[in-house]
Amino acid sequence: MIRQLFYLVLILCVFALTACSSHEQAEPKTPADTQSEQTQTSHPTEETENQTDTNHSNTENTPSDGSESAPQEDNMKYAIGDVALNSGYRMPVLGLGTWTLSDDEAEDCVYFAIKTGYRLIDTAQYYGNEKGVGKGLKRAIDDGIVKREDVFVTSKIMPGNYSSPDDSIDESAKKLGLDYIDLMLIHQSGAHDEQVYQALAKAVKRGIVRSIGISNYYTSNEFERMKNAADIVPAVVQNENHLYYQNTDLKAYLKQYNTVVESWYPLGGRGHTKEQFQNETIVRIAEKHHKTAPQIILRYQIQSGYIAIPGSSNHDHIAENYDIFDFELTDDEMQEILNLDKGIRYENW
């Protein structure tokens, strides 16, 4: 009996020593192993990414000229919502328009807008305020509110400079104080505009402009003429666009090229805002959502797939126009507002 107990204890000791030896021989985890495990755990699944990217367009970021896509970190940075351009970059859906602002007003309003949350600023050579826009952006950067890559800046080459487009584009960048301009547009059709568009395409290759487009071109024929002038498809067409002129036919046509319609005068423009703000349909929908008429109109714009750039020198209005990301219009409301389109343009540019 004693001998049996002795053998049993001996066997148990052998098993215990074997287990300890096996545990000691296992390779310890290196810091790299630990980091790899943490990385695999922290990366969201594809399904999670799709759920969290609801503000982003599903359009692939393939540049229209066939070159490599823009850096991914540049493409997903606008918390207020953005759209994918066919250039491979992303563009915020709401911005500040600066038409009629002086340099001093532009500096003040751009700074305030960026502080409020805007990440898209629209200017033009014709406005005469590129220096002010640049100063406002620089103040925001110097104050640590944003980095340069956080803000999308648009300018436009004016007809008077169509004879020397390369120098004109460089001069805009200089006045803005920028190494590159996010989007450069031809301001309107005119003599030599096809050559100007070729210069814009060249500016993309030079790296001084990232995306290009056209402004105040309202028909598919006009678009095709400009598109065929160079090897880069326009990323944006910026036109008059509001309740009573919604560019629906052009917008539908441009979809095949992943070209986005951007709206100047999205609230109707000077002398016409009151009529649109007092529209019975807009007033009723605004009361339902506890929002103002301009907020309903701007919400409709971005929810329809447009980019809107309302302009103002009033800080309260700038802040009000930005406050449109905490609600959505229903499908029925969207259809009601769509039905308000009368095909009426207020300007003849």
Name every feature range the model reports, one short phrase each.
Residues M1-F6:
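Positively charged n-region of N-terminal signal peptides that target proteins for export
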Residues S21-P28:
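Bacterial lipoprotein signal-peptidase II cleavage site
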Residues K29-E68, M76:
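Post-signal peptide N-terminal segment of mature Sec-exported envelope proteins
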Residues H56, N61-E149, L267-G268:
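N-terminal binding-site loop/beta-alpha segment at the start of enzyme catalytic domains
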Residues K147-N161, D182-S189, N216, N241:
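A short, structured active-site edge motif that brings together acidic residues
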Residues Q188-W349:
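Beta/alpha (TIM)-barrel catalytic core signal, keyed to glycine-rich beta->alpha loops juxtaposed to Asp/Glu
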